[in-house]
C-alpha cells in the first residue's frame, strides 16, 4: 500500500505533463490545419506565456517599486487566478502581432512562412533569455 501512495504523485505529475504536451500538440495541429502554415514559434509563445504567468504570480523585478510591494500583499491564490487570465491575454497580443507579420506570406511558397516563424521563435526565445536569464526560476506554491 505504501508503494502505491509513494507512486501516486509521480503518476499525477506524469499525467499532467502528458496533458500539457497534448495541449501544445493540438494547438500546433490546429494552426497547421486552419492556416496551412507550420508555425515554429508555437512552442516559444507557450514558453513566453509561462514566463509571463511567473511574473504575474511573483513579481520580483525592481522596476515595479511600490506596486510590487502592494501586489505581493495579495493572496497567492488570487495571483494565480490573475496569471491564468493575464498571461494568455498578453501572449495573444504577441500572437496577433506575429499573425500580422505572417499575412504577406499567405498564398506564397510555404518556405516563407516557415522561415518567418522560425525567426520569430528565435527572437522570442532570445528575449526570454535576456529578460529572465537561463537559470531555473522558482515560484511560490499555494497551500
Over which residues does each language-model region extend?
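Small-residue-rich transmembrane alpha-helical segments that form helix-helix packing/gating elements
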Residues: 1-35, 40-143
Amino acid at each position: 500500500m505504501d508503494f502505491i501512495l509513494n507512486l501516486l504523485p509521480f503518476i499525477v505529475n506524469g499525467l499532467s505533463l502528458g496533458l500539457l504536451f497534448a495541449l501544445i500538440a493540438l494547438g500546433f495541429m490546429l494552426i497547421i490545419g486552419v492556416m496551412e502554415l507550420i508555425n515554429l514559434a508555437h512552442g516559444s509563445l507557450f514558453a513566453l506565456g509561462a514566463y509571463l504567468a511567473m511574473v504575474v504570480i511573483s513579481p520580483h523585478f525592481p522596476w515595479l517599486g511600490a506596486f510590487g510591494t502592494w501586489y505581493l500583499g495579495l493572496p497567492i491564490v488570487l495571483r494565480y487566478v490573475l496569471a491564468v487570465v493575464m498571461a494568455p491575454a498578453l501572449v495573444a497580443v504577441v500572437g496577433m502581432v506575429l499573425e500580422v507579420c505572417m499575412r504577406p506570406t499567405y498564398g506564397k511558397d510555404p518556405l516563407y512562412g516557415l522561415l518567418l516563424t522560425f525567426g520569430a521563435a528565435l527572437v522570442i526565445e532570445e528575449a526570454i533569455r535576456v529578460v529572465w536569464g537561463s537559470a531555473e526560476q522558482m515560484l511560490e506554491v499555494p497551500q
